[in-house]
Amino acid sequence: MIEVRNLTKKYRELTVIDNFSHTFHEGKVYGVMGENGAGKSTLFRCIAGIELYDGTVIVSEDRQIGYMGDTPFYYSYVTGMEHIEFCLRAKGKDVGRDEIERLNDKFALPLGRYASRYSMGMKKRLMLLTLMLQDNDIIIMDEPFNGIDLAGTIILRQWLKEMKAKGKCVILSSHIVSAISDICDEITYIHKGKVVADFSGMSAESIEHYILEEFLSPVP
């Protein structure tokens, strides 16, 4: 479980996250939506402990957080396999290459090649493969559906359902309403750093209509 209390993030005079509070429970998938610049990525980095912030984030004891950012980054001369092994060692996970290769059968990544030379779609799949192998208790994913193909989307959706069934806590963001509306237990909408709407239990069509009417309508 993660309990967030009054989380605020400012860059000088600019308030990016404004007094955000929420409790994220195990065994649930949470969706966060919002326009570009609404504060989703900053919020995720704060909860994951990557950025400093004002407020409180309480993580249940002995729970490991896995974080997948929206922009892949890999060092120039590190292969896909070396990247995975480095990330696993950083988490204290002992996963053999046979297991890595077995899971990679779904992604068909050339793990012997330098990851920095992968296409954008391949880089995203490598991020996802690495996160899957880490077996974290709490999973934070920033725009995981961006840049992946149909097969990757299907694999990701199946995996999210498996994580929920295993009692993991998953927090993700997406602009693709149809990709998350039937997976997420709760969906919140952030506008200018504040939660302004709760779409939990609503259909994808209803969510899209609400967003268009309330937030994306042209200014008269």
What are the residue ranges of the model-derived segments?
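Conserved structural motif at the start of ABC-family nucleotide-binding domains
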Residues: 2, 17-19
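The feature captures the beta-strand-to-loop junction immediately N-terminal to the Walker
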Residues: 33-35
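Helix-to-loop junction immediately C-terminal to a conserved catalytic motif
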Residues: 48
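Q-loop/switch helix immediately C-terminal to the Walker
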Residues: 71, 77-90
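Catalytic Walker B motif of ABC-type/P-loop ATPase nucleotide-binding domains
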Residues: 139-143
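Helix N-cap at the start of a conserved alpha-helix in ABC-type nucleotide-binding domains
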Residues: 150-152
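H-loop/switch region of ABC-family ATPase nucleotide-binding domains
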Residues: 173-175
